[in-house]
Design a protein with these regions (language model features):
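Nucleotide-activated donor-binding/catalytic signature segment of Leloir-type glycosyltransferases, i.e.
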Residues: 32-48
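Conserved catalytic-core segment of nucleotide-activated headgroup transferases in glycan assembly
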Residues: 1-33
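Flexible, charged surface loops at secondary-structure boundaries
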Residues: 12-16, 36-38, 56-60
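Post-HExxH zinc-binding segment in Zn-dependent metallohydrolases
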Residues: 96-109
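Short active-site oxyanion
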Residues: 17-20, 42, 60-63
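A donor-sugar binding/catalytic signature common to diverse glycosyltransferases
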Residues: 48-97
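Hydrophobic beta-strand segments of well-ordered beta-sheets in folded domains
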Residues: 16-22, 82-83, 118-122
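C-terminal amphipathic helix plus adjacent low-complexity
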Residues: 107-176
Length: 176
């Protein structure tokens, strides 16, 4: 989506010398063409990371933009502020998923910040035009401590649940 460039530009406007680590592929190719047009931004393209190293990669960053549901889950577990770039699905089902995720993630936030969080997802996922993106990013960065605390709280909650594999084994053993 071309919206990623606009979002990165706005994030770079809020962060001094922002470093964006991008995994090789079409988005990295597009951003390499834009890198001289985005002030305060440095881009580092890296090869695909093995799954067992992906959590470490996510955890090494202050904020992440992830693609897909598996990456979303991993980003939630490492406790970093995130934006989810969902894969399109039939019948627009991804809009319902984005909306439900944003409602869950921002529960208890002030209404304007909830709306900004939803809107950045709608913009990135092509459900909303990019007008107002500067305002949306500004609201999110003005409330970055809330965003960080929320990310850490969700990570703690998920980590307390334990390993899905072990929970399945425990469940199965209880049935015996």
């Amino acid at each position: 989506t071309p919206m990623i460039e606009s979002i990165i530009k706005e994030i770079a406007d809020h962060v001094y010398d922002a470093l964006f680590t991008v995994i090789e592929g079409p988005i990295a190719d597009r951003l390499s063409q834009e890198k001289n047009k985005i002030e305060n931004a440095l881009f580092k393209t890296i090869p695909f990371v093995p799954q067992n190293n992906f959590n470490d990669l996510l955890g090494a960053h202050d904020m992440v933009i992830v693609r897909g549901e598996d990456s979303l889950t991993r980003a939630l577990v490492v406790g970093r502020p995130l934006i989810w770039h969902i894969y399109p699905q039939e019948n627009g089902a991804h809009l319902d998923k984005i909306t439900a995720f944003c409602d869950w993630y921002t529960k208890g936030w002030p209404e304007d910040v909830q709306k900004a969080f939803l809107n950045i997802h709608l913009i990135l996922n092509d459900f909303m035009p990019q007008e107002g993106i500067k305002y949306v990013i500004n609201i999110l960065f003005l409330n970055k401590n809330l965003w960080i605390e929320t990310a850490q709280r969700h990570a703690h909650t998920l980590q307390k649940k334990g390993s899905a594999a072990q929970n399945l084994v425990d469940f199965w053993q209880k049935l015996r």
